[in-house]
Curated annotation (Swiss-Prot):
The keyword NADP does not apply. Necessary for efficient RNA polymerase transcription elongation past template-encoded arresting sites. The arresting sites in DNA have the property of trapping a certain fraction of elongating RNA polymerases that pass through, resulting in locked ternary complexes. Cleavage of the nascent transcript by cleavage factors such as GreA or GreB allows the resumption of elongation from the new 3'terminus. GreA releases sequences of 2 to 3 nucleotides. Belongs to the GreA/GreB family. The gene is greA. One of its GO terms (biological process) is regulation of DNA-templated transcription elongation. GO terms for molecular function: DNA binding; RNA polymerase binding. It holds the Pfam family GreA_GreB. InterPro entries: GreA/GreB_C_sf (IPR036953), TF_GreA/GreB_CS (IPR018151), Tscrpt_elong_fac_GreA (IPR006359), Tscrpt_elong_fac_GreA/B (IPR028624), Tscrpt_elong_fac_GreA/B_C (IPR001437), Tscrpt_elong_fac_GreA/B_fam (IPR023459), Tscrpt_elong_fac_GreA/B_N (IPR022691), Tscrpt_elong_fac_GreA/B_N_sf (IPR036805). It comes from Rhizobium leguminosarum bv. viciae. This is Transcription elongation factor GreA. Keywords: DNA-binding, Transcription, Transcription regulation.
Length: 158
């Protein structure tokens, strides 16, 4: 059975855009660079040729990865999500029980995670600790700097 990859609609669109760019813009650019480098003669010592071939390999690998991800994507409509329990797509406001610093995270798919933007992967330790909890609950997360305790202040959707 094919393992589905949970994703927000925005994350799915970003993957599709990257796939389109790599196929329709980057691939032809690299092919042109290879042809240009090949025209310079001896390929054994042609750094431009080898760099272009390496870029082609990287691009084709990423295209394969993106095709696989978009095929397995399970796009979850966050506008239809509700409830008090935390699950995929939830925006969660937490307070650090030691420092009283507030943080807000949205739980997203692995491919969409960006901690600086407040999006954490569903497979991250903090997201795993949050799943199934609700406002008022406390969680403990083992972080690289030691254990952290948070209280859940708010859960929202969309």
């Amino acid at each position: 059975m094919v393992e589905k990859v949970p994703m927000t609609p925005g994350g799915f669109v970003k993957l599709q855009e990257e796939l389109r760019w790599r196929q329709q813009e980057e691939r032809p650019r690299i092919i042109e660079a290879i042809a240009e480098a090949r025209a310079h003669g001896d390929l054994s010592e042609n750094a431009e040729y080898h760099a272009a071939k390496e870029a082609q390999s990287h691009n084709e690998g990423r295209i394969s990865e993106l095709e696989d991800l978009t095929a397995r994507a399970e796009v979850i409509d966050l506008t239809k999500m509700s409830g008090d329990k935390i699950k995929f797509g939830a925006k969660v406001k937490l307070i650090d029980e030691d420092t009283e610093e507030e943080k807000t995270y949205q739980i997203v798919g692995d491919q969409e995670a960006d901690v600086k933007a407040g999006r954490i992967s569903i497979s991250s330790p903090i997201a795993r600790a949050l799943i199934g909890k609700e406002v008022g609950d406390s969680i403990e997360v083992n972080a690289p700097g030691g254990s952290k305790a948070y209280e859940i202040l708010q859960v929202s959707w969309g």
